[in-house]
């Protein structure tokens, strides 16, 4: 074989090896991707359960907070009405009996 032919054969061999390496890398990454997807599918139910549990806890806390806010607003309303009632009685010359300590 001539030197030129040997060079061409060697170049084509190098190209073939480069292509083979590329295909091998693609296969490895594809296999890794499939493995990650399977792993994610196994982990996903647990993540969903944790997220649902967190949502339930947050909802319970939000309900409790809303209840406290509503109770405070109701207490303020009763205090305001009581003050108004006392003022009306004072204007009429009457008053509540208040025991002093």
From Swiss-Prot:
Keywords: Cell projection, Cilium, Cytoplasm, Cytoskeleton, Flagellum. PANTHER family: C1ORF189, CILIA- AND FLAGELLA-ASSOCIATED PROTEIN 141. Microtubule inner protein component of sperm flagellar doublet microtubules. InterPro entries: CFAP141. It comes from the Eukaryota. The gene is CFAP141. Pfam families: CFAP141. It is found in: Cytoplasm, Cytoskeleton, Cilium axoneme; Cytoplasm, Cytoskeleton, Flagellum axoneme. One of its GO terms (cellular component) is axonemal A tubule inner sheath. This is Cilia- and flagella-associated protein 141.
